[in-house]
């Protein structure tokens, strides 16, 4: 029997009296204050005597239930409706008042929220990140609908969300009310009851009774096509394997039972389902709620205590040395002035007294301040005459540093770095042996890391891993400096920029942690600069250790699959929620290797290189790993689209002939193998965003980040390719000498004349000026191309001459 909606309406209205009598609070047996069934004559005097008392108790009970409902709704229902829309808001609220308070209490217990909003529900923050597939929905009748035209949606997840459009229609339009209850039924079956043990055991008899009925009315009302077509009786195993189908039936039955003018339809066509809902009483819901609380460890204290208990023996067995090591991991050790001064030779001390630190272009502000403090301490040993002499020397800050002074400050720069294990692991991608730090300190890092690895021997275990989520708040810039400044809305810092967020999310598929993650057992409020809120599910074999104050330290070198990225709102401020699951790092490494193989095959073909040439390398080890890989495609396409193909092929072949690479990485550039042969400028390159290494003929690009004057990583890559053009042009001029063309007298003279006419970074030296001019000449912005021709015409002509020379060689 194919039940039409119109028919349901007629039946519903014809049974309106019945419906009204059945529309009291559901699942909760109410005391009937006046009269009842049975032998009235025998008890009429007693009942009349107690009538007032029963009525009073009844009113008190209903009042208690109403207060309980209001208290729950205060916690889970958020009204986001303008003042003039109050009538629409109230209509939606009245729908929720018909839902049993115990159902809403279970929803509250799992962290669920209900939002009543104006207009298009897809514009709500919780639904903005939905995929296009999930925006195609079906209503309770199986009719297709587009979410932006619909009025209610239940979003599943660890903390489910129900979004309801405010509308007066719910008062008269019972179908709209029915669909709201249908979505609530989905939450009840999918997000709550499915989490308890044997959730469908009692529902099995209901389904089989409907299936074996003499007519198909109950199936037509509630069953999905798959359930209708199932040839035999349903078993528990079948229901467990087809839980979505069962949840659909439950949600429909719930909706028909709750909506007053449709309740009689359920009783008429599927009486077994009606009786099931009718008996789904307060006691059963309470049992479900208790089981749910126990299984999900909803109490924050209980969750904390269980983890502490799991790691109690581990904590008790820690030696003082082990505790000190974990403290060292959490709190970087700042350098001590006295230790640094003591390590200096007398000659170095004399040099430090006279160096004009402000004129150093490779020291950070913090480093300059620290070195000035060293100078002050050393000056105490000067005579008054020497101090006066030193003051006169330092008045003129325009004097450049001598080469000797530069080399000394480069050495000293390493000595003033904090001893920070996690930062070191992040900078190197866990490759501790890279030579970007002096040997003694490197050995200390290796010892400490090996000892911490040994401490973290206990896994989280199968009893805990699937029941807990761990949390980490993160500064956006620690993940992506490119988008970090733009992700927060510039007009309202409580909001996230939607356009930038979509770009941020698009390439975020997997992650790697090469250092030790320190995570919170329970989510904590974010600091001002923490706008990323990670929620991480562990694997049972994740090794961890318990720290004080509700934190765990996780092993290094783990993989993370990104399950969802969405904007959430907490305390009137928007954050980005990243849901991730711990997986073996090897699984993520395989994804990266497959992507590297694919991109090399594509570009080898495009550039006419041998099939198995390994031109492109992904040296990726950190938390925004997938973005490095995905962005490489965009960077290379923009490079190809903005530079002459003949020039690209000629220069790329030159690089390949020298075993050169295009290295896309998220670790600092001095730690890249292709850079090891080029260590004389290692100190300046710690924070470099890009680098061309003539010795290895390789372009290194650090991301996700951008330089001071670069709009994106593509411009950085074109700048570095400009250095490769400089190198190849010099090689063609004299293959024996193989010097940069920018070292020619002709270009040195051009630099003296035009070197200050383009960008501040271009003023650094001849090579950087050439690369900056090359970048501007191949910009997607026509105005920047003209800028070189107008402001540096000789440079423009010189570079064009080199391009023609290379192409025709």
Swiss-Prot record:
Record annotation: effect of changing residue 269 to A: Impaired interaction with interaction with the cleaved form of protective antigen (PA-63)
Region I: start-end pairs: 60-295
Catalytic activities: Preferred amino acids around the cleavage site can be denoted BBBBxHx-|-H, in which B denotes Arg or Lys, H denotes a hydrophobic amino acid, and x is any amino acid. The only known protein substrates are mitogen-activated protein (MAP) kinase kinases
Location of region: 5 X approximate repeats: 315-416
Effect ascribed to mutating residue 185 to A: No effect on PA-binding ability
Superkingdom field: Bacteria
Localization per record: Secreted; Host cytoplasm, Host cytosol
Comment on bound cofactor: Binds 1 zinc ion per subunit.
Known outcome of mutating residue 184 to A: Loss of ability to bind to PA
Entry similarity comment: Belongs to the peptidase M34 family.
The protein's name: Lethal factor
Annotated source species: Bacillus anthracis
């Amino acid at each position: 029997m194919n039940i039409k909606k119109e028919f349901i309406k007629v039946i519903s209205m014809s049974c309106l009296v019945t419906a009204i009598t059945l529309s009291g609070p559901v699942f909760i047996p109410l005391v009937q204050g006046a009269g009842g069934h049975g032998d009235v004559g025998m008890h009429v005097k007693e009942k009349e005597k107690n009538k007032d008392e029963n009525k009073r108790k009844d009113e008190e009970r209903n009042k208690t239930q109403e207060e309980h409902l209001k208290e729950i709704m205060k916690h889970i229902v958020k009204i986001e409706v303008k003042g003039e829309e109050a009538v629409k808001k109230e209509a939606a609220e009245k729908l929720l008042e018909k839902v049993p308070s115990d159902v809403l209490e279970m929803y509250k217990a799992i962290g669920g929220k209900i939002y009543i909003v104006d207009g298009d529900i897809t514009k709500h923050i919780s639904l903005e990140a939905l995929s296009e597939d999930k925006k195609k929905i079906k209503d309770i009748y199986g009719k297709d609908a587009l979410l932006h035209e619909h009025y209610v949606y239940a979003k599943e997840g660890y903390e489910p969300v129900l979004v309801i459009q405010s509308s007066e229609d719910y008062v008269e339009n019972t179908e709209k009310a029915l669909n709201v209850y249908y979505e609530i039924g989905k939450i009840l079956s999918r997000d709550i009851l499915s989490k308890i043990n044997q959730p469908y055991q009692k529902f099995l008899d209901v389904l089989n009774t409907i299936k074996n009925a003499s007519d198909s009315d109950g199936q037509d009302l509630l069953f999905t096509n798959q359930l209708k077509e199932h040839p035999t009786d349903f078993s528990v195993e079948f229901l467990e394997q087809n839980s979505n189908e069962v949840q659909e039936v439950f949600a429909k039955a719930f909706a028909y039972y709750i909506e007053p003018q449709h309740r009689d339809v359920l009783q008429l066509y599927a009486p077994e389902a009606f009786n099931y809902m009718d008996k789904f009483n307060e006691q059963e819901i309470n049992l479900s709620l208790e089981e749910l609380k126990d299984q999900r460890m909803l109490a924050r204290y209980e969750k904390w205590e269980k983890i502490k208990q799991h790691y109690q023996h581990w904590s008790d067995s820690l030696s003082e040395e082990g505790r000190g090591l974990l403290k060292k991991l959490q709190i970087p050790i700042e350098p001590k002035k006295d230790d640094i001064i003591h390590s200096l030779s007398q000659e170095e001390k004399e040099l430090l007294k006279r160096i004009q630190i402000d004129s150093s272009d490779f020291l950070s502000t913090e480093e300059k301040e620290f070195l000035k403090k060293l100078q002050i301490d050393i000056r105490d040993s000067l005579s008054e005459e020497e101090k006066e002499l030193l003051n006169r020397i330092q008045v003129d800050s325009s004097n450049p540093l001598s080469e000797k002074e530069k080399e000394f400050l480069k050495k000293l720069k390493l000595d003033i770095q904090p001893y920070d294990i996690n930062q070191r692991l992040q900078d190197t991608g866990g490759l501790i042996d890279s030579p970007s730090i002096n040997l003694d300190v490197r050995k200390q890092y290796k010892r400490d890391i090996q000892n911490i690895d040994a401490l973290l021997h206990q896994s989280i275990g199968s009893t805990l891993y699937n029941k807990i989520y761990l949390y980490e708040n993160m500064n956006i810039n620690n993940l992506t400096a490119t988008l970090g400044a733009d992700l927060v809305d510039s007009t309202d810092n409580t909001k996230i920029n939607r356009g930038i967020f979509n770009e941020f999310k698009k390439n975020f598929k997997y992650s790697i942690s090469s250092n030790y993650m320190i995570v919170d057992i329970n989510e904590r409020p974010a600091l001002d600069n923490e706008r990323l809120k990670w929620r991480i599910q562990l694997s049972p074999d994740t090794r961890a250790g318990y720290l004080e104050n509700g934190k765990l330290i996780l092993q290094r070198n783990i993989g993370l699959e990104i399950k969802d990225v969405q904007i959430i709102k907490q305390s009137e401020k928007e954050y980005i929620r990243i849901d991730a699951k711990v997986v073996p790092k090897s699984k993520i490494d395989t994804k990266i290797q497959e992507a590297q193989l694919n991109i090399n095959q594509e570009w080898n073909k495009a550039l006419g290189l041998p099939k198995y040439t390994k031109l492109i390398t992904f040296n990726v080890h950190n938390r925004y790993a997938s973005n490095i890989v995905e962005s490489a495609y965009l960077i290379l396409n923009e490079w190809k689209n903005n530079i002459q193909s003949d020039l690209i092929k000629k220069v790329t072949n030159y690089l390949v002939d020298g075993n050169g690479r295009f290295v896309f990485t998220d670790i600092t550039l001095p730690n890249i193998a292709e850079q090891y042969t080029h260590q004389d400028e290692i100190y300046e390159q710690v924070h470099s965003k890009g680098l061309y290494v003539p010795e290895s003929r390789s372009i290194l690009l650090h991301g996700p980040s951008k330089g001071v004057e670069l709009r994106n990583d593509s411009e950085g890559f074109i700048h570095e390719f400009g250095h490769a053009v400089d190198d190849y042009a010099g090689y063609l001029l004299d293959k024996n000498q193989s010097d940069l063309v920018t070292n020619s007298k002709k270009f040195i003279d051009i630099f003296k004349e035009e070197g200050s006419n383009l960008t501040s970074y271009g003023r650094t030296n001849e090579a950087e000026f050439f690369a900056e001019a090359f970048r501007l000449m191949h910009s997607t912005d026509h105005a920047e191309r003209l800028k070189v021709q107008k402001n540096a015409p000789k440079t423009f002509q010189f570079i064009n001459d080199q391009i023609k020379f290379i192409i025709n060689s």
